[in-house]
Swiss-Prot record:
Record text on subunit structure and interactions: Homodimer.
Keyword Ribosomal protein found: no
E.C. number(s) listed in UniProt: 2.1.2.1
Function: Catalyzes the reversible interconversion of serine and glycine with tetrahydrofolate (THF) serving as the one-carbon carrier. This reaction serves as the major source of one-carbon groups required for the biosynthesis of purines, thymidylate, methionine, and other important biomolecules. Also exhibits THF-independent aldolase activity toward beta-hydroxyamino acids, producing glycine and aldehydes, via a retro-aldol mechanism.
Cofactor(s) in the UniProt record: pyridoxal 5'-phosphate
GO BP terms in the entry: glycine biosynthetic process from serine; tetrahydrofolate interconversion
Protein name: Serine hydroxymethyltransferase
Taxonomic source organism: Neisseria meningitidis serogroup C / serotype 2a (strain ATCC 700532 / DSM 15464 / FAM18)
GO molecular function annotations of the record: glycine hydroxymethyltransferase activity; pyridoxal phosphate binding
């Protein structure tokens, strides 16, 4: 019998110490990685609940195990809430990740060797959209599109490639593209060649839920998202559709094809996050995320840096570091010393290797969750520029670090 009185610190002090150190790091550093965010205490409570003990293969009302009457309630809450959030008729909340959600979509209607048309990883796409190193690029014949000379998504190229290659599926969505994507234009192109349209909205889902970015669901055959990033939920995935045409194929593609039992404690945490995203205050959050990202981009341009695509219309943007004569790898390290966390990221036509890069990716979702406003975002952008202008000067890094500490103390991740 387990005792409820035994704490993790008592039983496993080594692990507890590592968790405490990570908790302190999150408090002391400003998080600018676009794919990261902070979840509420309610989300963490759900994910740390006794639901982790329950196996529940199948779907609500159709389980292969007994004792599922309460986890059925949990999963149905998550399904109903996410459908309401995005105006979908179908939802599957079981994918363990966005990548697995994407795999399930492909497997539901494609056969190995079928052609897919997705955004190039080098131009801001995602590994799972047909990159050669990913299963999507190994199992299917992947053709890629990119940005035009102005670093705007090249819809003319998408149409030309679609007409030339006749893909069975067109994939839209990105992991490092700052501007709004025209879902209606993609629908028009897909219809011209009789292709399925699949949108991966993982990065933009929170903005879409908050009404600050166009909703792809009405235009698409399939939509996937992660539940973290801008949506501020636990790490996981979701599949959505505007109707129930592919319900049977998608459900079987997740279980039993790709996964076994769902993670009921994570699904519970998803349900909490969906409820949070349905509240009026989430709309204010999404609006502030965009304001903060735009403010940071503007300040960095004033400091001599170049923003890929010229601006941002979302939570994310890429910074071209070539004018500063510094690589993304070096910038990430220097900013880290100043307690600013970013990730190195390739820019279009990047001359550097993927593990070095000529850019960094910046996102405003996590800092906005802490409470940073537009004025704070502008201060922060100038601190980033201070580091990049003199990345090897320890006194400079120390000065920035002190100012970051003051900002972080002003906006704790978790208040009283």
């Amino acid at each position: 019998m387990f005792s409820k009185s035994v704490t993790l610190a008592q039983y496993d002090p080594d692990l507890a110490a590592a968790i405490a150190q990570e908790d302190q790091r999150q408090q002391d550093h400003v998080e600018l990685i676009a794919s990261e965010n902070y979840v509420s205490c309610a989300v963490m409570e759900a994910q740390g609940s006794q639901l982790t003990n329950k196996y529940a293969e199948g779907y609500p009302g159709k389980r292969y195990y007994g004792g599922c009457e309460y986890v059925d309630i949990v999963e149905q809450l998550a399904i109903d809430r996410v459908k309401k959030l995005f105006g979908a008729q179908y939802a599957n909340v079981q994918p363990h990740s966005g990548s697995q959600a994407n795999q399930a979509v492909y497997a539901s209607v494609l056969k190995p060797g079928d052609t897919i048309l997705g955004m190039s990883l080098a131009h801001g796409g995602h590994l799972t959209h047909g990159a050669s190193v990913n299963i999507s690029g190994k199992l299917y014949n992947a053709v890629t599109y990119g940005l035009d000379e102005n670093e705007v998504l090249d819809y003319a190229e998408v149409e030309r490639l679609a007409l030339e290659h006749k893909p069975k599926m067109i994939v839209a969505g990105a992991s490092a593209y700052a501007l709004q994507i025209d879902w209606a234009k993609f629908r028009e192109i897909a219809d011209k060649v009789g292709a399925y349209l699949f949108v991966d909205m993982a990065h933009y889902a929170g903005l879409i839920a908050g009404g600050e970015y166009p909703n792809p669901v009405p235009f698409c055959d399939f939509v996937t998202t992660t539940t973290h990033k801008t949506l501020r939920g636990p790490r996981g995935g979701v599949i959505l559709c505007r109707d129930n045409t592919h319900e049977k194929a998608l459900n079987s593609s997740i279980f039993p094809s790709l996964q076994g039992g769902p993670l009921m404690h994570v699904i519970a945490a998803k349900a909490v996050a969906f409820k949070e995203a349905l509240q009026p205050e989430f709309k204010q959050y999404a609006k502030q995320v965009k304001i903060n990202a735009a403010a940071m981009a503007e300040e960095l341009v004033k400091r001599g840096l170049r923003i890929v695509s010229g601006r941002t219309e979302s939570h994310v943007f890429l910074v071209d570091l070539q004018p500063m004569k510094i690589t993304g790898k070096a910038a990430e390290a220097a900013l880290g010393k100043a307690h600013i966390t970013v990730n190195k990221n390739a820019i279009p036509n990047d001359p550097e290797k993927p593990f070095v890069t000529s850019g960094i990716r910046i996102g405003s979702a996590a800092m906005t969750t802490r409470g940073f406003n537009e004025a704070d975002a502008r201060v922060l952008a100038n601190l980033v520029a201070d580091v990049l202008s003199n990345p090897e000067d320890e006194a400079n890094l120390e000065n920035v670090r002190k100012q970051i500490t003051a900002l972080c103390d002003k906006y704790p991740v978790y208040g009283a």
